Amino acid sequence: MCGIVGMVAGRDVSGLLLEGLRRLEYRGYDSAGIAVVGSDCALRLLRCEGRVQSLCALLGQSPLCGTMGIAHTRWATHGKPCAANAHPHCSESVAIVHNGIVENHRSLREMLVTRGYFFHSQTDSEVLAHLLHWELRYTAHLLLAVKKVLTQVRGTYGLLCMDAASPGRLIAARSGSPLAVGLGCGENFVTSDPLALAHVTQRFLYLEEGDIADVHRDSVCVHDAQGNVVARPVVTYQMQLCTQDKGTHRHHMHQEIWQQPHAIRHTLNAYMSFSSSSRAQVRTFGEDRVLDGTSCKTFERLFRRITRVRIIACGTSYHAGLVARYWFEAFAGVGCQVEIASEYRYRTSVVHAREIVLTISQSGETADTIAALRLAKTQGYLCAIAICNGARSTLVRESDAVLLTHAGSEIGVASTKSFTTQLVCLLVLTRMIAQAKKILTQEPEDALSAALQRLPQDVEHVLECEADVARCARHFVHAQHALFLGRGELYPIAIESALKLKEISYIHAEAYAAGELKHGPLALVDAQMPVVAIAPASPGVLFEKMASNIEEVRARGGMLYIFTDVPERFGPVCTPEADAPEGACSQIVTVPSVSPLTAPIFYAVPLQLLAYHIALLKGTDIDQPRNLAKSVTVE
């Protein structure tokens, strides 16, 4: 969500700070600001509503120069988006930027007003600036003053402070919101996301819960929650400077949809080795807790013991978990329960014997998922495993074992390749457990190996259907509402596809298990209601049931959009090229046939394209949809 960048150096930092903010734009924000301290020890501030580009324009009109500074992109939680509510917040010589929520801000505000402080914003964060200014009246030591402030605060924070009266010094504090210190030569940095500092350093130390860092040009001193000086490990984080280059694509989301064959292949290669016979050997956990190709008998023994899996996640990651429930129960013979992290935290739950907890997050910094993990670790689970794209994230560091998704940087707020690579990891983990428990017989094991080996190529082939999907979007674009239907493992894909449409096109969409049509949703169907049906040919009775549900929609005059590999089963049919009257007949997107084992991953891709092309026609901000953030780091 919000982004923090801070620097203390021997050169002007204003341009470097702005570049850091540009690199954080993908996280989502509504305002931005910068404060610097110059050689005259004067604090100078610029803030604006809107994009970093607007802040750059302001800086062009009123240049700021200084060797120490902090900057911020804000995603509104308390107070509307406007310049006054943007960070940094100042109190005379003090400036702060803050990610998180100050839960007791009202009582603190009332106290500060009685002390003569005037508030310029509606935010909870401004109280931190005034509190720090108050404490500095009694001690000139910035670190001690920050510590005193934090004893009075309830809530979460990634906090970065500076005082013009203490030049060459930044104080960073972390509780519930990530911060990292970037290490340079004669200069040091602080950020909420290392990507922001890729242009100045690749060496970082990550603050742990309760840490406070005293950052100078030539030194960094970290104190833990007990006040002890500690040495946090320094890691080198190789980041590409061109991460945000869209290439030939109009949007990052479109680029990332097309990157999925590579991302899936990369993820599979990290965990599986395929022989010429299409049989795969699954690699197991290494000593660094990451599935990296090194055999580890400890986890094989653990997997043999597992009887249940509890999946905890939010948003798109939650939908990945819903798919995995089918896999764990069908292939590995273990019960599976999927929880929304924000709900799990606040209800009484029963942990079963020999149950593991599995968290899923793209960023690894999702506040509710991290809090749920911390709760789960006190409840007696056998093990805590994370599936994550953030190799050095909080979720990764606090889990017992990790499967990295190897999706690469994902800039678009709406997750695409992160989702499909999460599903790949979940299917690999399912297979590992099934192998450890000796449940898979040779035939289904070979079928799964072959399906996974073909998956990157299958996704490449379905991307070739983009023109048909785009033509369907023309008929869809003026709709106010939409309904998505699926069965079995494809029901969660319908849920995820409805979310994608909501996120980037702002069309209200709902998803239902197709068998639930007659229990309410059928009342919504008319000639103005688009209904998207996911209908692959599948073994057993599910396909015939789905075909029957589609006929129910057709009988009510619904606008049908069918994604299938057997178009001949759904006549009368209008091809995507036809400009048929709405509701007159079905629009069919014909996709290649794939294994039912990987169909959920495969069908997610054309439905991502559908949402993208509808949003493109509507002219919305596809990469940064309104009111949304890439990484939800507050509850």
Curated annotation (Swiss-Prot):
Catalyzes the first step in hexosamine metabolism, converting fructose-6P into glucosamine-6P using glutamine as a nitrogen source. It comes from the Bacteria. The keyword Ubl conjugation does not apply. This is Glutamine--fructose-6-phosphate aminotransferase [isomerizing]. GO terms for biological process: carbohydrate metabolic process; fructose 6-phosphate metabolic process; protein N-linked glycosylation; UDP-N-acetylglucosamine metabolic process. Residues 2-218 form the Glutamine amidotransferase type-2 domain. The gene is glmS. PANTHER family: GLUCOSAMINE--FRUCTOSE-6-PHOSPHATE AMINOTRANSFERASE, ISOMERIZING, GLUTAMINE--FRUCTOSE-6-PHOSPHATE TRANSAMINASE (ISOMERIZING). GO terms for cellular component: cytosol. The active site is at C2, K630. Residues 299-439, 472-625 form the SIS domain. It comes from Treponema pallidum (strain Nichols). GO terms for molecular function: carbohydrate derivative binding; glutamine-fructose-6-phosphate transaminase (isomerizing) activity.
